[in-house]
Amino acid sequence: MAQKIIRVGNIEIANDKPMVLFGGMNVLESRDMAMQVCEEYVRVTEKLGIPYVFKASFDKANRSSVTSYRGPGLEEGMRIFEDVKQAFGVPIITDVHEPAQAAVVAEVCDIIQLPAFLSRQTDLVVAMAKTGAVINIKKAQFLAPQEMKHILSKCEEAGNDQLILCERGSSFGYNNLVVDMLGFGIMKQFEYPVFFDVTHALQMPGGRADSAGGRRAQVTDLAKAGMSQSLAGLFLEAHPDPDNAKCDGPCALRLDKLEPFLAQLKALDELVKSFPTVETA
């Protein structure tokens, strides 16, 4: 099965290429923290030889509580992203929540992300597709892997085939998510690159009454399980002080654990992709 290659700058993204990292922090808390986090990601990924794209959100529009921190907003967020790109020369990925944001974000960011909760919103999908930017499509917690073909079709009909799919877990009763490992293979049949968002797969939605809980201690186990499926890359959020992060701290990797964590994932990715394909159908 031929696998599509998506190019972002000099990075090639495909299920049969070396893993790419979409990594950073959940939400922009400050310019200084964005610089601190990106600097460590750049140091580690350059040392390990992992192609890297910086990730953060300028607005978390789907927080559990109306009083929860959402981020600096569109204008300030784009200024911070421009500063990060200038300082480190890395591509940027961020999510958009409204059709009117798509073109503005695509002028600054290299990849625009369709949030899982909004992945069936046709107006948003079409607006994002029409920018011509690479789109990272998060699989909704309530969608089966095979249903992602409909979102891909919407983008393609709007003239965009620069697409990436991203697994982030499926609803399993209340306040819980599970990851169906067979779903990766189903989505890979569409031939687009598939990523694994291990951070949000660790969520316990609404698990802390007014915010999401998480299972940070299991991040390495779950990441290894996902990346054993020969994927295009990993989506990861880290924080210098997860217990005091303004969003999704319970799921975030400690920033000082980034290097040993990624070293194991890179070794696993290389091993898995060294195996010949065994046809069992």
Curated annotation (Swiss-Prot):
An annotated Gene Ontology molecular function: 3-deoxy-8-phosphooctulonate synthase activity
GO cellular component: cytoplasm
TM segment ranges: none
Main location: cytoplasm
Localization terms from the record: Cytoplasm
Catalytic activity: D-arabinose 5-phosphate + phosphoenolpyruvate + H2O = 3-deoxy-alpha-D-manno-2-octulosonate-8-phosphate + phosphate
EC identifiers of the protein: 2.5.1.55
GO BP, one annotated term: keto-3-deoxy-D-manno-octulosonic acid biosynthetic process
Listed name of the protein: 2-dehydro-3-deoxyphosphooctonate aldolase
